[in-house]
């Protein structure tokens, strides 16, 4: 299964993952489990009062798990300079310092600057608030024109990887091709050989329309260029 394969890839390698909602009991439980099993090195973001208060209230032991308070980060000035540079005139220093009080922006900058390898968020933050900092500060990987997302759905022995359910609202044909290629690449990174279907509201030509036409054209193009079924 995908989760097992991912654990094998990172276990014992000291991969640092930032958790933006270190005050949430679900996040703390996950961080404790990941650390105890040496899967990753979790980093909880939040104030000491928030993190300790949650742990005490829920009888959780977060001792030994790294914690970073955005209000007392020793490299904050360096982070501010870097973020001002990345925003290219869209945010001045004052606005950047305000934004970095949010653990979403702060955590994203930790990843961007190499202090962490990845970020997990969305337990309490909305999808938009979780994704926006990455779109602004990390952006698309080299060779990609857009950023897309994928969901992993697991039920018993079945697993599906679905993209793109949260980023691109009305993709055109070119976008659909790129999203499909990105999702297939992600599947392989997860240890799954992709077998792809493009979904719309038409079944075997039962309906026509712009959305159906885009999917049909994207499917035809992918059959010619893709190295998957």
Positions of PLM-derived features:
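Anion-binding alpha/beta catalytic cores of soluble intermediary-metabolism enzymes, centered on
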Residues: 1-229
């Amino acid at each position: 299964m995908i989760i097992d394969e991912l654990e094998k890839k990172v276990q014992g390698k000291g991969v640092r993952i930032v958790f933006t909602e270190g005050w949430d009991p679900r996040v703390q439980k996950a961080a404790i489990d990941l650390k105890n099993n040496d899967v990753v090195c979790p980093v909880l973001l939040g104030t000491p009062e928030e993190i300790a208060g949650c742990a005490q209230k829920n009888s959780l032991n977060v001792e030994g798990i790294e914690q970073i308070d955005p209000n007392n980060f020793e490299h904050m000035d360096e982070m501010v300079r870097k973020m001002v540079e990345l925003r290219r005139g869209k945010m001045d220093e004052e606005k950047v310092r305000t934004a970095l009080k949010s653990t979403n922006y702060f955590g994203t900058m930790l990843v961007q600057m190499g202090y962490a390898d990845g970020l997990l968020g969305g337990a309490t933050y909305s999808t938009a608030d979780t994704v926006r900092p990455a779109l602004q500060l990390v952006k698309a990987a080299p060779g990609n024109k857009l950023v897309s997302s994928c969901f992993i759905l697991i039920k018993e022995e079945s697993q599906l990887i679905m993209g793109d359910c949260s980023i691109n609202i009305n993709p055109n044909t070119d976008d659909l091709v790129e999203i499909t290629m990105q999702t297939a690449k992600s599947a392989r990174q997860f240890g799954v050989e992709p077998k792809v279907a493009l979904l719309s509201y038409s079944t075997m030509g039962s309906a026509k329309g712009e959305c159906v036409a885009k999917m049909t054209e994207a499917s035809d193009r992918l059959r010619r260029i893709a190295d998957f079924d």
